[in-house]
Amino acid sequence: MSNKHSACQVQFRVIVVGAGIGGLSAAVALANRGHSVLVLESTTKLSHVGAGVALPPTTRKWYESEGVLRAESGCIPLDGIELRKWDTGELVTRTAANPIGKQNAIHHGDMQQALLARAAQLDNISIRLGARVMDIDIDSNTVLLHNGEQVEGDVIIAADGVKSVIKPKICPPGASKAQSTGEAAYRFTLARDLLKDDEELLDLVQRSWATRWDGPSRHVVAYPVRNHQLLNVVLIHPDDGNTEESWTTVADKQDVIEHYQDWNLTLNKLIHLAPTQVPNFRMFLYPPSPVWVKGSTILLGDACHAMLPYLGQGVGQAADDAVAIATVLSTIEHREQLPLALQAYEVSRKSRVEQIQAATYQAREHLHLKDREAQAARDLQRKSASESNQNSDVVKMQHSYWVWDAAKVAQIALTELITG
């Protein structure tokens, strides 16, 4: 094993449940600092499917420092975002990247593959597929697998998503109860070759810009991923209520066409190029987890703070969780300080992500105005803000999240707990 990070002073055996982006991020960060990591993933094959995800500039920088992101990872720094009227497609404003750094776009599968590739370079990470966790004994730090096998560690990280098996063992009953937002998202990607014969559509995938159309009860965003070889398209729309609480169902393309038939021509051209079957994700609001830590078991990522997509904070906040837990576990000098380290992890992360969860939910109201006069006033405000070099409230809020130093905050929390 070789890495440039400071080695931990106490080595822990860490079990990570879940090989999604959050779990793998924590695994790589901990292994880079000398801990022994076992990742347990219930699926028998990691298929690297999905759509585009956003990486804030600080998150991308951290992944690069951990040896995860390379040129071939297909991550695109975006020069900015164009906001257009939903019905005519007329340009409202172009907001260039903030001086802090650029928002980045990457395909979910490419991000996961980059993490797996880095994990394969580290001899203190082991990943077991088809290892479905059925139960956990917090007192003995043991997880029970579907085949009856018991696996013991010093620390257990539950990164097993919104339907976490472990979360009910940590939180009181009802803590995971989801509330429908009344909205869902169609997601699809279009290959560059499909767009090459239409100059307007080709421009969407060639340029390093995101485009967003905000309309009544809906909005759509499109941006390039995979080194400009794919255009990622996400269409938020009212939920018909027929989708169960699950990751996805499949809709007919005709359903998508009907939802946006009154929208601008550019968007409708994109929709007509979509696959005949389009994934449809129902979006739920999950209440803040009252507890993140119990014994030596912690929650991470969607297991404790599932994010709605309106501010593009899902991956960034999961990565900050990974930063925080790697920092505190690698700083303590004695095993007896482990409870304080885990407490510092929760203290440094919980209130922050709760604020972001609330802000994300509120942001959708700004995007989905139904009244045309309200839309016009919003668009005028956006245009004026752009012309005076002042970002809109939503963009300013988003950028404020990018200057956060999760490692520093976790370190401060740990120091305060140790010194009393």
UniProtKB/Swiss-Prot annotation:
A Pfam family hit: FAD_binding_3
GO biological process, one term: terpenoid biosynthetic process
UniProt topology in membrane: Single-pass membrane protein
Cofactor(s) in the UniProt record: FAD
Tagged with keyword Ubl conjugation: no
Leader sequence residues: none
Domain of life: Eukaryota
GO molecular function, one term: FAD binding
Keywords tagged on the record: FAD, Flavoprotein, Glycoprotein, Membrane, Monooxygenase, Oxidoreductase, Transmembrane, Transmembrane helix
GO cellular component: membrane
Glycosylation sites: 124, 264
Gene3D superfamilies, per database record: FAD/NAD(P)-binding domain (3.50.50.60)
Role according to the record: FAD-dependent monooxygenase; part of the gene cluster that mediates the biosynthesis of the meroterpenoids nectripenoids A and B, as well as cochliquninone D and isocochliquninone E. The pathway probably begins with the HR-PKS ntnH that catalyzes two chain-extension steps to form a reduced triketide, which then primes the SAT domain in the NR-PKS ntnG to initiate three more cycles of extension to give a linear hexaketide corresponding to the polyketide part of nectripenoids.
UniProt name for this protein: FAD-dependent monooxygenase ntnJ
